[in-house]
Structures are given as C-alpha cells and as structure tokens.
Amino acid sequence: MPIAYKNINQLWAYIFTETLKRLGLAYAVICPGSRSTPLAVAFAQQAPNIEAISILDERSAAFFALGIAKATNRPVAIVCTSGTAGANFYPAVIEAQESRVPLLLLTADRPPELRDCHSGQTIDQMKLYGSYPNWQAELALPVSDMGMLAYLRQTLVHSWYRMQAPTPGPVHLNIPFRDPLAPIPDGTDLSYLLAKFHPEEFFAGITDTTPLPHHSPLSIPPEWLQSQRGIIIAGVAQPQQPQEYCRAIARLSQTLQWPVLAEGLSPVRNYADFNPYLISTYDLILRNQQLATRLAPDMVIQIGDMPTSKELRNWIDTHQPRRWVIDPSDQNLDPLHGRTTHLRIRVEELGYQGVEEDKSSVSEYLQLWCNAETKVRVNVDETLDKMEDLVECKAAWLLSQMLPPETPLFIANSMPVRDVEFFWKPNNLRVRSHFNRGANGIDGTLSTALGISHRQQSSVLITGDLALLHDTNGFLIRNKFVGHLTIILINNNGGGIFEMLPIAKFEPPFEEFFGTPQDIDFAQLCTTYNVQHELIHSWVHLQQRLNPLPNTGIRVLELRTNRKIDAQWRRDNLSNFAADNII
C-alpha cells in the first residue's frame, strides 16, 4: 500500500476513496472543516485520478459539484464537516433530485457519544435532506476489522449504483469519526489487520459497471399512426447523447407526420437540420386565439418535462387531448393532470418494426403548423434584427446565432429561460444548453455555471442581476476554476419577471418587495473578486465579444437595460407576432 496507516480513520478513508476511484469518480469537491479531515486528506492523496477541489462556501460548492455532474453526466462527490455545513448543501440536493443529477453527499459527523449533549458543532444529520436523496445511510464508526472494511466497500458500491439507477439523483452518506482526525498514531495496532489486507484482492472487480436501464423496444401504438392531428412536444431536456436524442425525435416526427414543438431548453432547436417539422414559435402562435383553436390536437406526445410556456400549458389544458409522456424516470411529468399515459422509456427506445414513414403528402394540419412557424419566425427575426436599443430579449436571439459550435451554455432562471423559449432561433450549432429547471430557483446560478465550464470548452452564462447577486460567492471559485466562462449579465436592476405579473400594477408595494432594485456597481464588484468586467454599449459590441471566446478566466459582459421598458416591449409585441397569421 502507498501509505503507512497510522490510525483506523486513515485506513477507513483510504478504503472509501480508493473504492470510489475504482468505480470511476473523477471529481471531489471539499469544503474546509475539521471533522472531515480523514476524507479530505484521502481524496487529496488520490490525485491525479480524482481531482480534489477546495471550495469555501458549502452552498456554492454543492452547486459547483452539480454543474460538473451535469456537464460530465458522471457522479461527483462533495465533502463537508459536521454541524450546519451540510445544511448548506440542501438547495443543490433538491435541484439534483428534481433534475436527476448524480451527487454523492458526504457529511462528516461526530460519534454518537458526542451527540445530544452540546458538544459543539453537532446537529442531527440523519436524513438531513428529507426524502430528496435516492438513498441515504449513516456509516458505522471506523473499525479495524476486515469484515467492516468489506462492509464499507460494498456500501459505496451500492451508493454508486443508487446515484445512477433506476433514476439518477443524489445519495447521502453521513460519516462519523472519532479523534484523532489527522493522520497521527492513536495507539491502535493495525499490523495484524494490514497483514491480511491485500488491496488488489480486496478491490478485485470494483469497476464502473453501473447497469443502464434497458428496455425492449416499445412498438409505436397504433392510435398514433392513425391520427393526423397529433403533435410532439420536445420539452425541457439535457440528454446524455443529444444528437441521438434529436435523431430519435426527428424519426418519430417523420414517421407520424406530426410537428415537433421544441422548447428552447431542448437540444432539438440546436440540431434543427434533423427535423423539417420543427416549431419554435409555438408560444407566439398560440397567442392568436383563432389560430390556436384551429391547431387544437387530438393527441400529444410529450418527451421530457413540460415546456415553460403558459400559453402552451393553457392551450393543452383547454382542449384536453389524449397524451403520452415519454421519459425513463419514475417521476410524474404531467402538471396538468390530463388523460396521460407515462411510457417509462427513452425516446431512442421506440420500436419501428413493421412501421414505415409516411411518404405521402403532408397533412393539412401539419402544413398549417409549418406555415404558421414560417411566418411568425420571419416576423420575429425581422423585428429583432432591426432592434438597436438594448432590450433584453434580443440577447437570447443573438446568442442562438453567434456562439461558437458546441458551446456549453448555462441559462439562468426567471427571464432568461423564458426569453430562450420565446426567441431562441433554430440552428445547427449543437450548443450544449444547461439549466436548473428541477426546482427552478435562482440560487447557485454562478456556481453551477462554473461547474459546467470546469475543464470544458469555453462556456457562457446568461443571467439577470438578481440571480448573479444571489450567488456572488461563486466568484471565490475563480482560483480553482480551469477553463473560461463568459457571463452575459442582463442588468435591469431588479426582478424583471415580476414586471410581467399582475402585482406590477400595485405600487406600493411593488418596487420594494418585488422589483427589489439592488443598485450594485458590477464593475466594482468584479474588481473585488479580480474578475474582468466590460460594459456592453451595443449589439454589435456584444457580437464582437462572443466569437471567438477566450480560453481562460472569468469575465462579465454587462448589458444595462430598463426592466419597465423591457416589460412594455413584451406586452406590445409577444401577442402581435402571429396576430395577422390567420391562414
């Protein structure tokens, strides 16, 4: 063995990290603290196989780990000390569960005899995250026994599996340690144990063999083939293999001759050449009530989560079509509680044996959708192309055309995700979009984006000012971060999304409690964190900064907008793009 083990905690932590290394763990985020010392030291000693990244703030660290897991589609471990430290992981744990991301939460704890007696930095850490983990357990105290070392190894093997199957999500292990925590002698004679411990024999067969759920191909239901008034909704999705995912949706669309209403947060819009029946302006089309009635479907296939659009949701709720949801998770993805059947498979697992694509003429219903898309798309593009003022909605439209191919993009919640849904233009850039749409919070925005960008291609974050301010501790990661992140900051000095809600008409209390202007000088803020800042003066200026992107560092490109003008622009235009589009 590479290390002379001086106490049982050190050996226990070695077994712990060595097992995870052999299972395939590549990243461990470590928050500073005393009780977690054995794990921190052991993870550090696993370099370069495991990159151990030290991050001060636990909430930020958890979202950074979440971002890495999203980008790599692999589990990431995060370690903290005892007490309230682990409570700061909670928002990221919720997001990991709701968006199905594998995270391994490792909370160090005091031994049982130091609990419930005011020993200090001790809280009840059992089931700290409620029902959100896929699985959770408290480990036994370290013991110098071969049987217990095998127990530790197999508990980690089981944890690795439960993070990824049957549905990805977080796993929480609470890990008590007695003193001494540092690798110093504790008087225990480990020689007899180490004489029986042969690492290659002990770890034999420990590899990343997590079985991916596999289903026999599901035959296309006959009723789908018989309907000419069906639609496919490509909803919010971050598939591991976006190209295969988009090809599968395109094949289904062309087989059924149904249009694909593709969310801006679906990769389908970034692989537009695959799908001739792609509808990107459905939210705008459905604001024309007469046209929306003519387009009412008999059947709907929803792939992944329901899109954000309230127009789409209300339209489906009004017409109550027969619906199917295709998604392998065990979650209920129908917030409308309609006549819905959940097919627990991936869209790639649909079977086409004996089914031929319909090569006949396009149905009147499909043609109606395609004509509407063409006209509304032209209206949107012409309007935004002529726009010279810095109105925030144009940023999403511009990004969809200007980013380097395959750029990782993190889209913050509130208005950015909605502007992407409204205005993201179909393209063939294969942009890799990421987002926290599990619980839809603004917390952890910057840290998640940095995690997604770490050791990846130069990346972009589009965010509002409040979402960025909510997570400025993420800038503390800058010295650990490897790669580049450009932050497109839409600074409208407050919560622009609330300007679109009925409460905006009530002043007071609107500005104080909903608009919440913070009046922050972002140039000064960036100076504090030693982050590059540039004020963007025009759309041409922004385009010049987007392609190519730098290779290293973090920079903020700030667009100052007026949220009341932005809101008025939306009120004036969103319902008009399809107003004269009655076919």
From Swiss-Prot:
Swiss-Prot/TrEMBL cofactor(s): Mg(2+); Mn(2+); thiamine diphosphate
Catalysed reactions listed for this entry: isochorismate + 2-oxoglutarate + H(+) = 5-enolpyruvoyl-6-hydroxy-2-succinyl-cyclohex-3-ene-1-carboxylate + CO2
Cofactor note from UniProt? Answer: Binds 1 thiamine pyrophosphate per subunit.
What EC number is given for this enzyme? Answer: 2.2.1.9
Q: Name one GO biological process term.
A: phylloquinone biosynthetic process
| MF-aspect GO terms | 2-succinyl-5-enolpyruvyl-6-hydroxy-3-cyclohexene-1-carboxylic-acid synthase activity; magnesium ion binding; manganese ion binding; thiamine pyrophosphate binding
Pathway, according to UniProt? Answer: Quinol/quinone metabolism; 1,4-dihydroxy-2-naphthoate biosynthesis; 1,4-dihydroxy-2-naphthoate from chorismate: step 2/7; Cofactor biosynthesis; phylloquinone biosynthesis
The broad enzyme category this protein falls into is transferase
Record's family?
Belongs to the TPP enzyme family. MenD subfamily.
What does the record give as the function of this protein?
Catalyzes the thiamine diphosphate-dependent decarboxylation of 2-oxoglutarate and the subsequent addition of the resulting succinic semialdehyde-thiamine pyrophosphate anion to isochorismate to yield 2-succinyl-5-enolpyruvyl-6-hydroxy-3-cyclohexene-1-carboxylate (SEPHCHC).
> Which protein are we looking at?
2-succinyl-5-enolpyruvyl-6-hydroxy-3-cyclohexene-1-carboxylate synthase
Q: Which species is the source of this protein?
A: Nostoc sp. (strain PCC 7120 / SAG 25.82 / UTEX 2576)
